[in-house]
Amino acid sequence: MKIDVIIPVHRPGAELLELLDRLNGQSLLPRRIIIMNTRSKVQVEKILADRENVSVVSLEREEFDHGGTRDRAARLSDADYLLFMTQDALPADEYLLERLFRPFSDRRVKAAYARQLPREDCGELERYTRSFNYPKESRIKQLTDLPELGIKTFFCSNACAMYERATYLSQGGFIRRTIFNEDMIYAGGLVKSGYAIAYAADACVIHSHNYSGSEQFRRNFDLAVSQVDHPEVFSGIASEGEGIRLVKKTAAHCLRIGKP
């Protein structure tokens, strides 16, 4: 059983080296780490030249695409499983790969994503949002969960998510030419094809952002656009209720702790 890790990067700093060190210290080791590097002044090839299991594929900035770049890397791999990560997500311990792989023992499961824990400098709103989207309880999600979970049935995050490669290829992989949300679009297709997605709450990465109001608005706007652009996945599945539930719970949390 072989696992390859795929990480798109752009102007990476020291956090990438720490990420690679943590990946190569896992109880279940990756066979190969494929870095999809968008060219910049940072000489990624030179920085990583001494890393034996790291391959760097460089592309021009205009070539980068959230879905297409990841799909290109997937097709360079012959591993059994593909772990996609972002350059700013760090394994919380040495058991990330082992625990993320475990749900695949259920033959329905063709994708599994990790729990995201906030960084120490994370703001209170983002910290609460992380706990809302990434709770302490693991769950297997499939088509029969749609009445209960709605659009969250399709939720999956390529900040840290593993996929069975054979099914990934047979399903057509990530959508090409998409500004955002390639993970959820693919996951929705999986569920609609009769497969399941696992949320592995014991597989943890440290990953959060301190978005400004305008940045959060832009992200939400892009998310909405991606859903409109893919009615074959999202048509007839309401997302407003989940958003309203998050707003209400966040407001109640802020009132309870006395922070805006």
Please place each PLM-identified region on the residue numbering.
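A conserved acidic beta->alpha catalytic loop
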Residues: 37-45, 90
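Acidic donor-binding loop at a coil-to-helix junction in glycosyltransferase catalytic cores
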Residues: 179-186
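A recurrent flexible, glycine/aromatic-enriched loop bordering the glycosyltransferase active site
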Residues: 143-163, 179
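Non-catalytic, C-terminal membrane-associated alpha-helical segments of glycosyltransferases
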Residues: 219-225, 229, 236-260
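Short, well-formed alpha-helical segments that are part of the catalytic scaffolds
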Residues: 12-25
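Conserved donor NDP-sugar-binding/catalytic core segment of glycosyltransferases
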Residues: 90, 94-127
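Glycine-rich, basic loop-to-helix element that forms the pyrophosphate-binding segment
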Residues: 60-77
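Short aromatic/hydrophobic "clamp" motif used to bind/position activated sugar donors
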Residues: 82
